């Protein structure tokens, strides 16, 4: 709203000089107040994005607990989670943020903001880096689960740095920046719609899952995972309690992952001052996220009960996370009832891919490739089917009436764009992470020796087990410091 001296002065009285002076004073004051409101709006949006970044970062603790509970080598897997965050932070600062969001640029890769040079800018501030970094290390954390318990430490360092510094940022540039060739905010939309991968079923989950697939495939299964007849042998993790704790921490963090991807909350839809705005869409996104995860958890519970004959808490946790991974693409543009469909099918996808993994003797300790890669791909297809036109126009304004979900009367163009997204992500990650893992394998930098693997990486590579147990029954469980010994 603007204040005009010429418009306001006639209402202040017949004395023209005083009226003009008074109007000028009032308009100046009004302008100052208006500027403060603008500043307040920026502050609210910045606080919202920062809080969302903190939630997404807390997912690293969830990953750590989930991984620690699902495997036997606790010290090793905890160290790799810390490494993912630390190495990812440095390399995303140096290169990743620039490759992802460094516009103006071409449709393939960004070329500004290396080392956060020229930040803050008109487009981005420091909180954007923090939020995007949290996403990048989430992708690296997904990959670490697939290659757990048999991978050398140097391999973790190399793949994590490469994934967060180059592979993931390029994909996020394609789909999340105005310059990206398939972005829904590009001036030249792919198939007239662009790709709607709102919070990253493809950008984050498929990238991390496919990278993990190649790592686990090239390494081969863990020793003892299949017996001499080829029959599957369950290598259970050491703590179901940590699995459940990690799952709930990830659930909590997902409320920053999906709703936080709006980046702003103080946006009105329609006339200013209405009760319906982006804050409502944020709430709807949290609801769709919740419903998809809950439905997937229950479907997996009963599905696995039918197949295996027992109730398994780990299966339920993985099903829940599979539902979250699937809804991440379309969480902001689908109705709550559609999220239930998303979660139901995501559970079936997860169960189906796990059966294929067993058949082909593929060993992924966390089911990360099946969960994040498979369910992420389904989430992209789901969005192409169920994205609602009204919600799409609100979340991606500027080009009303663009193609939306096939089952919602929006035609098949969005679905076609999403199929292309799946194919290019598979191709890109295959062309980058596949050769990287193969080179590490050829140089004997990928897998540990069979002796170390059988003895346990915690003992052979990390100085001892994560837990100390005193064999004397009178002492029970206790913790103590173990001093290093020197050989004579």
Swiss-Prot record:
PROSITE patterns linked to this entry: AMMONIUM_TRANSP
Entry GO terms, CC: plasma membrane
Membrane topology listed for this record: Multi-pass membrane protein
InterPro entries reported in the protein's UniProt record: Ammonium/urea_transptr (IPR029020), Ammonium_transpt (IPR001905), Ammonium_transpt_CS (IPR018047), NH4_transpt_AmtB-like_dom (IPR024041)
Reported induction: By nitrogen deprivation.
Alphabetical GO biological process terms: ammonium homeostasis; ammonium transmembrane transport
Positions of transmembrane segments: 47-69, 90-109, 129-148, 153-175, 195-217, 238-257, 281-303, 316-333, 337-356, 368-387, 418-440
Annotated localization: Membrane
Tissues expressed in: Root hairs and leaves.
Domain of life: Eukaryota
GO molecular function: ammonium channel activity
Chief location bin: membrane
Keywords from the UniProt entry: Ammonia transport, Membrane, Transmembrane, Transmembrane helix, Transport
PANTHER family: AMMONIUM TRANSPORTER, AMMONIUM TRANSPORTER 1 MEMBER 1
Family as reported in the entry's similarity comment: Belongs to the ammonia transporter channel (TC 1.A.11.2) family.
Function: Ammonium transporter that may be involved in ammonium uptake from the soil.
Protein name per the record: Ammonium transporter 1 member 1
Organism: Solanum lycopersicum (Tomato)
Record gene name: AMT1-1
């Amino acid at each position: 709203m603007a204040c005009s001296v010429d418009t306001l002065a006639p209402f202040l009285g017949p004395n023209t000089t005083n009226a003009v002076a008074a109007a000028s004073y009032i308009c100046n004051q009004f302008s100052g107040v208006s500027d403060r409101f603008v500043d307040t709006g920026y502050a609210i949006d910045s606080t919202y994005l920062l809080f969302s970044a903190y939630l997404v970062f807390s997912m690293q603790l969830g990953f750590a607990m989930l991984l620690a509970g699902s495997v036997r080598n606790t010290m090793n897997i905890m160290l790799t989670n810390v490494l993912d965050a630390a190495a990812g932070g440095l390399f995303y600062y140096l290169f990743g943020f620039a490759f992802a969001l460094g516009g103006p640029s071409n449709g393939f890769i960004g070329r500004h903001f290396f080392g956060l040079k020229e930040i803050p800018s008109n487009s981005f501030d420091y909180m954007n880096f923090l939020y995007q970094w949290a996403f990048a290390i989430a992708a690296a954390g997904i990959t670490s689960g697939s290659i757990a318990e048999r991978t050398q430490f140097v391999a973790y360092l190399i793949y994590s740095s490469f994934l967060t510094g180059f592979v993931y940022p390029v994909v996020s540039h394609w789909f999340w920046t105005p310059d990206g060739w398939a972005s829904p905010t590009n001036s030249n939309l792919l198939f007239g719609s662009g790709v709607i991968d709102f919070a990253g079923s493809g950008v984050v989950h498929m990238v991390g899952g496919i990278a993990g697939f190649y790592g686990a495939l090239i390494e081969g299964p863990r020793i003892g995972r299949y017996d001499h007849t080829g029959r599957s042998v369950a290598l259970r993790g050491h703590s179901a309690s940590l699995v459940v704790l990690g799952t709930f921490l990830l659930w909590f963090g997902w409320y920053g992952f999906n709703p936080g991807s709006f980046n702003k909350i103080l946006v009105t839809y329609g006339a200013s001052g209405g009760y319906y705005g982006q804050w409502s869409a944020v709430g709807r996104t949290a609801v769709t996220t919740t419903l998809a995860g809950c439905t997937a958890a229950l479907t997996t519970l009963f599905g696995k009960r039918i197949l295996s004959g027992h109730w398994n808490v780990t299966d339920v946790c993985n099903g829940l996370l599979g539902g979250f991974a699937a809804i991440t693409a379309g969480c902001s543009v689908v109705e709550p009832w559609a999220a239930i469909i998303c979660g139901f099918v995501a559970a079936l996808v997860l169960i189906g891919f796990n059966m294929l993994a067993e058949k082909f003797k593929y060993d992924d300790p966390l089911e990360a490739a099946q969960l994040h890669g498979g369910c992420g791909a389904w989430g992209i297809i789901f969005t192409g089917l169920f994205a609602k036109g009204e919600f799409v126009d609100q979340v991606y304004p500027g080009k009303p009436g663009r193609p939306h979900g096939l089952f919602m009367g929006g035609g098949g163009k969005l679905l076609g764009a999403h199929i292309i997204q799946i194919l290019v992500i598979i191709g890109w990650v295959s062309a980058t992470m596949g050769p990287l893992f193969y080179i590490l394998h050829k140089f004997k930098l990928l897998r540990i020796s069979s002796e170390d693997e059988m003895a346990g990486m915690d003992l052979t590579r990390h100085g001892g087990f994560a837990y100390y147990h005193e064999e004397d029954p009178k002492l029970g469980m206790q913790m103590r410091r173990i001093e290093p010994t020197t050989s004579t």
